[in-house]
């Protein structure tokens, strides 16, 4: 069927900020979809609140709106643009929920706007637990016994009838939010109450638990002519009971017989046809390992995380084709872009194994609840491709960047057998490593299968890896053993460990016997047809399919999996760098391991290597491609950490040189450079042991800021107020980076701001200064940032620009640089310098219109700022005010304290832009879901050192009609100062303590600060947790509360009696 001519203008709804459960895969899907629709000649209007994405770049759509994804703002944009149709299926759960809201509000009918891709009825049938159950019964598809509840009592009654364990699944939520497995009535009451609150339709499904069944996923596509196909089938290593986003996944399925595969395939196609979905859809099924019995778990009637994985695993561009299907094209008339000859109707065939392992944030959140269940906790994921399961699994392990090069954690060798068995039974984020340790200790795979319900096939593969380790131990320097180990994915580093040699010795031995990896192409058709795509993975076989081109090439290193501190912003910079390399006439090669991102879309670069970002894997690609040089400054700390080893191996690092990277990272060298350049910094010293640290703190004076050197995202950074706390920090936290000393700095509580600069070593372009709303002490990634600055004098701004220029030239910066400053008593101090792209690059690029990563790349390749038409110094400011606000995922992470501090905790960001600060702030708060009522009750529970400042805020809240409530100490202080506050009870006073008031909806906001020492007491943490659980705005920094107050005051009228 030809594409539709009756629609011209299509609105695409993005997925908003990155949170756990909805990450960069939607940037990838949305970007593909917008470009596909433009390719077909439609006018595309995009709305999304996330500035860190490629999707929100001007050239991706005809018009891009970076506005809050709320009914209020989307409605305004629709009325302004009058699109003929809306495509909501590429914006994750956010997009679907927005489509439902627009429909319920009557806006779609009122303006005669059509929904493309998935009908509202299909969204309802797949997402509404009751309708889904009815549809499955009509189709004769088995689902676990279940009931829909609207109250906790209904849930309890059902569970008493069918027995425990049961699973709770709230309707219309994302990543299993609010759900869980319940083994007792107490757990059921707690989880159901929370689930009903989080479900926008106050509805939960309570179903019999089928934990222990195999979990299988089918990624299917259908068009308007009812053609349907399976793009990819995937099997979870972990059985049912763990969210698929938190499971290790293999594609294609590994343990199914042909009969089982056909049975589940038929079920999936039957379901997508019944739902009449036009586009992509994900079906999750549970299969009894001992019979042909199966259940349908759920259906996602949209592009999902699994579709991004399926796209990258097969090379089949699901989102691109889903967008074209939505406008009427059919699978049998679209060419598969990978082969360029076959049609999209061909089901992909795989002649390799793909492994996906989730990346969890528990290196950041040591106290987080690591137990995995039906609610997702991973922030990102890695993918690896190999010719056998062992190879793909081991490549994925070393892609995780958690300090392992193999499925082994050396620290586990010290734990007792008893603890080991407990960890194997309890599914936590690191269970793979405990399973492997158990096999090394001689536990049989049959024992492990009965404890974990993980299929024997997978456990046998782990056993095989251990057997190869043993073979290596017995045959040191044996060539055949080396060949075998390499064929099954062992790294040089692991082999070196076993043979007690250096990694370089193994590399030399391989080279002396011409043992190099070859690169195979991902071609969707198991080499049946010629493929046109330059998308490769390494393996140790005979035939190499990747040929070095005649053109000079440049290798760009990506940033690996998304984690807190290193998000999609670095992928944004990578993609822009590649564009600039191509424009300059070079071949651009990307190397990355993250299946969710735009950078690993094979159409972005001239060549894509889907490989771990380790020294060995990068060197193998360099040996083959012989690039002119490697660019490391866009891949976050991942790529920067490889620079030294690559440089020592004779590789040309383009841009800022390794010794200059070192000068910015190494404390003593940096201090020396600042002295030479005449730039002040907070007093500080380096310490390599406890004695030196105490000596330094004594000399500088408490409070001090302590942190390890060479870290990203404020990992293990703390503000310490006395000697005892400092000793405790050194003994517990410095594990973060053992080879490097710790830094002890004077802690200055002043205004923070940061600058991104671009230089070629002679002149420096400063696109803009971003002023932080929160004062020093809150990590820059968790602060709200304002551009242009609202409270910095012209003189301060000039000083900042001058220091930035001196730093860029003094540190021989070629490309990008980020500098953070703190200002106290009109004195500007430099806190830190990062000689690489930072997380603010996308935001600043969007608000200034300067394509920063592209310009930086052109400078790296030898052009000057003058050549590109830019002048030295600070770029003229924009007329609008722009706010970048952080977004957190605390609802997904039990036991992680939401108190903000020097360690980064946010997972994403949103942007608000308008003509005034108040309007921009309002948009930013709306976009990050901090919606505050115009009036109500606000609770203050404040540390002694900030009570005076909190008092003036409380007075202002009272003036606009809020009722002030406070805890005992705070209320007493307010009363002394003449402000009466309603006293709330101590934690445990069941009737009126804060958690109880919050639970019953009596509190509209909480302001809670702790002293500089920051030791969060149990009560404070309970208060903060209750706010997070119930979705009540929580402010742990007075500056954020002040910003919110500014918005409320600007929206209030003055009402006074005459």
UniProtKB/Swiss-Prot annotation:
Stretches the record annotates as Carboxyphosphate synthetic domain: 1-401
Annotated residues for binding of ATP 2: 707, 746, 748, 752, 777-780, 820, 832
Signal peptide from the UniProt entry: none
Region (Allosteric domain): 930-1058
Annotated ranges, domain MGS-like: 930-1058
Family annotation (Pfam families): CPSase_L_D2, CPSase_L_D3, MGS
Gene Ontology terms describing biological process: 'de novo' UMP biosynthetic process; glutamine metabolic process; L-arginine biosynthetic process
Cofactor note: Binds 4 Mg(2+) or Mn(2+) ions per subunit.
Keyword Aminoacyl-tRNA synthetase recorded: no
Binding-site list for Mg(2+) 4: 832, 834
Known catalytic reactions: hydrogencarbonate + L-glutamine + 2 ATP + H2O = carbamoyl phosphate + L-glutamate + 2 ADP + phosphate + 2 H(+)
The EC number(s) this enzyme carries: 6.3.4.16, 6.3.5.5
Residue ranges, annotated region (Oligomerization domain): 402-546
Domain statement: The large subunit is composed of 2 ATP-grasp domains that are involved in binding the 2 ATP molecules needed for carbamoyl phosphate synthesis. The N-terminal ATP-grasp domain (referred to as the carboxyphosphate synthetic component) catalyzes the ATP-dependent phosphorylation of hydrogencarbonate to carboxyphosphate and the subsequent nucleophilic attack by ammonia to form a carbamate intermediate.
Designated name of the protein: Carbamoyl phosphate synthase large chain
Species of provenance: Streptococcus pyogenes serotype M3 (strain SSI-1)
Chain's gene name: carB
